Amino acid sequence: MLQRAHKHSSPFASTPPHTRQKEIGEIMGRHLAVELLSSGFFEGIDMLVPVPLHKKKEKLRGYNQSEWIARGVSVITLIPVFTSGMVREKNTETQTHKSAFERWENVDGIFRVTIPEYFSGKHILIIDDVLTTGATTVACATAFDKVEDIRISILTLAVAE
């Protein structure tokens, strides 16, 4: 299901990720959840799974913006955030200046589910900050291919045009 709460430019668009404060992600996650709550979008979702950063990138940045967006969504929906079931195995280059094809190549096979049995029989909501080509979120969802009886939905804060 594709549902747009509002069509606005992202408040993050003009600032590089490393200069953003994590609290902004949580606030935006709360606002997003409030906008979607009455639509039934969150019904049946068992857990929120933020798109993971590579541990080196997260250490350098100090936080994972998708995790903080997920935390904000969780405050409103009371759906738990689960951050330890998937890892980003490759520290890829930034996607900012890549073509659509290069973005898909850059993220191919970079995620691994570490606890597949935990997700079996669950409906998870993968949360990312910005959807551009969909390459990252599809790569993330594809990592769950071997998990039995899983349902996956995706939520992003912003869609780049």
Predicted feature locations:
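PRPP-dependent phosphoribosyltransferase catalytic core
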Residues: L125, A135-E161
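Active-site-facing substrate-recognition patch
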Residues: M1-M47, H54-R71, V75-L78, F82-H123, ...
